[in-house]
Amino acid sequence: MRIIHRLTQYQRLFQKFGENLASTTVSEVAGLLFCSERHARTLIQQLQANGWLSWHSQVGRGKRAQLQCLKSPDTLRATYMQAFLEQGDHQAALELAQLEPERLQALLNPHMGGQWQADSPVLRIPYYRMLEPLNPLTATGRAEQHLIYTLHAGLTRFNTGCPQPQPDLAHHWQVSDDGLTWQFFLRSQLRWHNGERLHGQQLLQTLKLLRSNTRSQPSFANILTITLPHALCLQFTLSQPDYWLAHRLADLPCRLFHPDNPLLGAGPFKLATFEQHLLRLEQHEFYHLQHPYLEIIEYWITPNLMVQSTDGSCQHPVRITIGQEEDFPLARPVQRSMSLGFCYLAVNQHRSNMTSQQLARLLMLVQTSGILEELSIRRGIITPSHEMLPGWPIPRFASDNDSPLPAHLILIYQPPMELKSVAEQLKVVLAAQGCTLEIRASHDKQWKDSHQIEKADLLLADHLVGESPEAAMESWLRLDPLWRGILSPSQWEQQQKTLTHIQQIELASERHHQLREHYNDLMLSGLILPLFNYQYQVNAPPRINGVTLTAYGWFDFSQAWLPPTAT
């Protein structure tokens, strides 16, 4: 864009001459801007016409002209940033933002938060890291998963704060008396984000893709066939009853995208821009449910400019502040919640070959060493876990046996950053017991396969739990390679039988009870130990309303709204 190039050229002049009156020649300006003298004269005339500089030349060979820069580059960038954003030219604004990375935070701050521009409510969020591609079959990050729920619809969906699956692309569904046939009735007039009609045959193709994908296949393991007996009816025929099915179809692995393009969905927002420094969502004008209040949501990504706050939490991914810098004194915690998900320690027993006494001693040391309590005080964003889910207490381990721990153990930890601290502190605790802990970092946010897990005795990772906690915990046992890695073949087979039995129980409370008992057995056997939960928080200035935290710690984009600004 020409204006970006002009700003770059003017920046060179300003760096050379500043705001003071300076003596120079056209030849010197041409050398500074790496152009011909003829082009330099044209540029000087243009900058003078724009009011950026003054130029007074004198007649005669060798005479020097008087040049003065009238505006700072920062002022010009701020002016054009405002103009581009008001015009909706986010591409130009993005190019302008990339012009001076070291000044990006100051440049963007006045435009962050909620604003009305061109009669449309816009929410801009500064974000601390690059985002993964928003492919439902590959994305692993918490922010990415939240965005995928926003972009893609399913046959069913979870509303924020409600654990029961609700209608989405399907307006109703019915189940046969034997629980083996489920029919989902599609809404008429459904459309993809590009405006094309959404057809049942396309959903059938997408479901076929999901059934063959490694990540989502376990969610469909009990399904014999999926057919389209009518243009607006999808029918699932099961090998055994599965009363989690409506929950599964609302979950991330079953989000329905266009069969030819995994980034094209039918959710409340559509993906307009996905670039290194900017993600832009726009309202889906053909959305089949209540339309969001916001027209546009933008993530401005500035990973190198996020400064640690005094309390160590401002830029942490579980703490989100919406607004401009001058709003921060007014920003208040509008929503707080304890994460249902948790960070955990898993033990690969058939690799470590620890005895039950050694295992009890190891877990007792984790629970009584004060590692988690110290981390809670130091970071201020976590709480040591006492329950796996509300009403699912974690056993306390004790050991009267002084049998030594293994001389050497290998631990692999994943993000988030707190798990690195836990690993380092645990290394000190175990060293005092004569056990050397070898720590290895994994940069994956999820376990890729069981081979990765088989290389470690101990594993530290984060488990996200969605709006329907029990359904999420059941899916975890099916979907996460962790369990294939830490369970012996016989344990894995027994777990599959247990899950098959539980899924056939029609009464939800009894399903939940038996699932809780299974997890209690896993904890008592020392396979899994929840460590801590996060304290999710969203801060916002008074003018931003309807901020509702989701189970993933983000806020529901469909509920937030801004009152119109006075004219």
PLM-predicted stretches and their roles:
Residues F286-F328:
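Ligand-site clamp/hinge motif
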Residues Q48, Q58, R361, L365-A398, ...:
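Detector for C-terminal structural segments
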Residues M130-E144, E196, A246-D251, N539-S558:
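A structural "hinge/loop" feature
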Residues P126-V175:
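N-terminal lobe/hinge region of extracytoplasmic solute-binding protein
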Residues Q66, S216-P262, A266-L278:
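Surface-exposed binding/hinge segments that line
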Residues L21-S27, L33-H39, G51-S57, S399-D462:
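Ligand/substrate-recognition segments at binding pockets and active sites
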Residues G18-A22, R41, T140-R142, H172-T214:
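Aromatic- and charge-enriched surface segment that lines or borders ligand/interaction sites
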Residues E282-E285, Q335-R361:
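A bilobed periplasmic-binding-protein/Venus flytrap-type ligand-binding module shared by bacterial periplasmic
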